[in-house]
């Protein structure tokens, strides 16, 4: 099993969720986050003064999937979240050693 963590633009969330649902991924965790990458934010003009906006709003999407769905999941996120502009986000993939559903005690792929 792998945990896929994607930082995406907030307005892309519904499209990404639908795309993942289309390939059979129904469970996910979403967190509103703020961050920046290489571009280190941008400047904005407010009441005649220029301000540096360091941390931009993003959505962190987390899913745990069987190994055989990893590539398909990554492709779905990229195809749906990509705008071609700076700040599209990042995807990280982690190994998950064990998963347990608290309510039933099911483990690993049965738990996801």
From Swiss-Prot:
Assigned GO CC terms: cytosol
UniProt function note: P-II indirectly controls the transcription of the glutamine synthetase gene (GlnA). P-II prevents NR-II-catalyzed conversion of NR-I to NR-I-phosphate, the transcriptional activator of GlnA. When P-II is uridylylated to P-II-UMP, these events are reversed. When the ratio of Gln to 2-ketoglutarate decreases, P-II is uridylylated to P-II-UMP, which causes the deadenylation of glutamine synthetase by GlnE, so activating the enzyme.
GO biological process: regulation of nitrogen utilization
KW Phosphoprotein (keyword) present: yes
Gene: glnB
Superkingdom: Bacteria
Keyword ATP-binding: no
Name of the molecule in the record: Nitrogen regulatory protein P-II
UniProt PTM: Uridylylated/deuridylylated by GlnD.
Organism: Haemophilus influenzae (strain ATCC 51907 / DSM 11121 / KW20 / Rd)
Stated family: Belongs to the P(II) protein family.
Keywords for the protein's UniProt record, in alphabetical order: Nucleotide-binding, Phosphoprotein, Transcription, Transcription regulation
């Amino acid at each position: 099993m792998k945990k896929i963590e994607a930082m995406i633009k907030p307005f892309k969330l519904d499209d990404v969720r639908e795309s993942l649902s289309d390939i059979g991924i129904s469970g996910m965790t979403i967190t509103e986050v703020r961050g920046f990458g290489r571009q280190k934010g941008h400047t904005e003009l407010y009441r005649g003064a220029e301000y540096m906006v360091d941390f931009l709003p993003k959505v962190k999407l987390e899913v745990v999937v069987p190994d055989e769905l990893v590539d398909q999941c990554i492709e779905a996120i990229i195809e749906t979240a990509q705008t071609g502009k700076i700040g599209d986000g990042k995807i990280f993939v982690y190994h998950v050693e064990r998963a347990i559903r608290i309510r039933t005690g099911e483990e690993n792929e049965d738990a996801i």
